[in-house]
Regions:
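Membrane-embedded helix-loop-helix hairpins and adjacent transmembrane boundary segments
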Residues: 1-380
């Protein structure tokens, strides 16, 4: 894309688009690492900084060796695994354990409570604050007010306070921001251009249309299964945890125990490695062709460009690991800023404006007579 810009508008425009291209790749990779590290820490207890630094190595190893071909092959395989996990979760929520009627009834009961009823039912005064993943004082859990956050009562800005309406003020605003903001991000993201150029011309347009339809199934299915199940079951997931994308692991762990945690980790790793590989290839392409060959060595051979690409993949992975750790250490708000784009996994949680979460709610319980692994094997 940057080469097209240089040929049409010259050096100044080329450098401008090159800068925004790098920014887009860094932002997307940051969201992958920060969201992935938060989930890994919540489910396994691995140190957040360590997880953020180690995750890129799964991308570096095969991307630097296989290049764009390895990225395409791995993405296809990873997508199959992701869809398998999504189908399992939807089947569990709406067929195996609950039904659409039950989930609807639970949600209707949740939004029927008034604020006074919610406070009376879910008051935790004088008790230890506990969320789904953590326990501690209100300050330690990030609860800024004396009253814990809770998922109870009607949703402000939604028609009739429902979680199931399309008439949502917050949802409309999110849609506008997402379309406007992510359109620019996609336009300057080299990974999309590489996929289009690598495909046959007659297959590129059809491929992107079908790919968009297939992608839509993932956030839509996760939001309407794990997202709504979290609200229906009133799981003790705090607002900050929901914003960090921890709703799916909470629901999966609640329904399947360790088996659910393993499935979410597998799905998460597949998504991170697949997208991270594409972003790494995009950065290496920008550096090799738009920086090295354009401004440093115009007479570069194919072998030299390949060597530069592989070096950049390794260096970019190391840089992003350190970048994620530094932001996590230096400013916890960066995670919230990044995740508010809902770009990592918009289906992993409902929109943040719909959450009013309590940190200590356990209303509905699942009968524990059948182990989670037996339930999963029976489903399969």
């Amino acid at each position: 894309m940057c080469e097209i810009v240089r040929a049409r508008w010259g050096k100044a425009a080329h450098i401008t688009f090159l800068f925004f291209g790098f920014c887009a790749n860094i932002i997307v990779t940051s969201m992958l690492l920060l969201g992935g590290a938060a989930t890994v820490q919540a489910l396994t207890g691995v140190n957040y900084a360590l997880a953020a630094f180690l995750i890129p190595w799964g991308v570096i190893l095969y991307t630097s060796a296989g290049g764009l071909k390895a990225t395409f092959m791995a993405s296809y395989l990873h997508t199959m695994i992701i869809f398998t996990v999504v189908i399992i979760m939807v089947t569990l929520v709406y067929i195996k354990i609950y039904s659409s009627d039950q989930v609807y009834s639970f949600l209707a009961q949740t939004v029927a409570y008034s604020d006074e009823q919610c406070m009376a039912i879910f008051s935790t005064e004088g008790t230890q604050e506990t969320s789904f993943f953590y326990s501690g004082t209100a300050d330690q859990l990030g609860l800024t007010s004396g009253t814990p956050q809770y998922s109870c009562g009607p949703v402000q800005g939604n028609k009739q306070g429902s979680y199931l309406t399309m008439l949502s003020g917050g949802g409309l605003m999110f849609g506008i921001i997402n379309i406007v903001g992510n359109f620019g991000t996609v336009f300057v993201d080299q990974s999309y251009w590489q996929s289009a150029i690598a495909a046959r011309p007659e297959a590129a347009a059809k491929g992107y249309l079908l790919g968009g339809i297939c992608w839509f199934a993932i956030p839509f299915s996760l939001a309407t299964s794990l997202g709504l199940a979290s609200m229906a079951l009133m799981l003790p997931v705090t607002r900050s945890e929901a914003g960090a994308g921890l709703v799916p692991p909470a629901v999966a762990d609640y329904l399947l125990g360790n088996a659910g945690a393993v499935l979410i980790l597998i799905m998460l790793f597949m998504a991170i490695v697949s997208t991270g590989s594409a972003e790494s290839i995009a950065v290496s392409s920008l550096v090799a062709y738009d920086v090295y060959r354009e401004y440093i060595n115009p007479e570069a051979t194919g072998k030299q460009i390949l060597w530069v690409s592989r070096v950049v993949i390794v260096l970019f992975g190391l840089f992003m690991g350190l970048f994620a750790v530094s932001f996590m250490r230096g400013s916890g708000s960066f995670l919230r800023i990044v995740l508010k784009k809902e770009f990592i996994s918009p289906g992993f949680s409902l929109h943040h404006s719909t959450y009013r979460l309590h940190s200590t709610i356990w209303v509905l319980t699942l009968d524990g007579s059948t182990s989670s692994w037996e339930l999963l094997l029976d489903l399969l």
